[in-house]
Amino acid sequence: MSFDDGVVKAQTDPFALKRGGHNVQKWTSYALFKLFKEFRINKNYSKLIDFLTENFPNNVKNKTFNFSSTGHLFHSLHAYVPSVSDLVKERKQIRLQTEYLAKLFNNTINDFKLYTELYEFIERTEGVDCCCPCQLLHKSLLNTKNYVENLNCKLFDIKPPKFKKEPFDNILYKYSLNYKSLLLKKKEKHTSTGCTRKKKIKHRQILNDKVIYLQNSNKNKLFELSGLSLKSCRHDFVTVESQTRAGDEIASFIRYCRLCGMSGC
């Protein structure tokens, strides 16, 4: 697919405005990408602000540039990369300040390099119906999500499905963007948190002064864990007949106290 730097179709361009009787120039995402690339390389942040303000005034408000209803047109400006998490949403606006743009461009260096190589892939590959690299990223993400879902639903007696790589996945791996690895880690984290065991809590009693010196304790008895009494036993001895070995006809007579169990003479 080769990119046309000229006019885009009206239905794909959100800036069909008229100023002074003339149509505002209609931009393609690739044409804007090449301009944004020059601004990044030359670090012309003030010129970039002037360019956005002059050409897209309807998206500028209070030194803020909004991306509402712009489609893929400005994805290369902030190098939008879809996230595996549903909590991370697409950026809706940026501040038109030189310090902010310098920080934004510095934080998205690798993402913009990824966009550059994906644009080159789209341009040299026939049959790729995409106008923005984020469409390829979404395709790779969707393919990986389907693979992980099929992996979760597989039966034990059926071979697991094979992961089918996209032709451009190697470009993603080059910039450490591996949706398969990220989604599998997310799956493992989800299963491990769902099967967590409850930790057993041992309640230990510490022998402190409050336990030892009980005011209401019985003075005639020791502490509970000994199980003995201070009073002497009033023995009540009994004699029983017991066979000491199995199959032995000899029986022994044992004399013991039935109260404390002490053997008698």
UniProtKB/Swiss-Prot annotation:
GO terms for cellular component: host cell nucleus. Keywords: Host nucleus, Transcription, Transcription regulation. It is found in: Host nucleus. InterPro entries: Baculo_LEF5_C, Baculo_LEF5_N. Plays a role in the transcription of late viral genes. May function as an transcriptional initiation factor. This is Late expression factor 5. It comes from the Viruses. Interacts (via N-terminus) with itself. Belongs to the baculoviridae LEF-5 family. GO terms for biological process: DNA-templated viral transcription; regulation of DNA-templated transcription. It holds the Pfam family Baculo_LEF5_C.
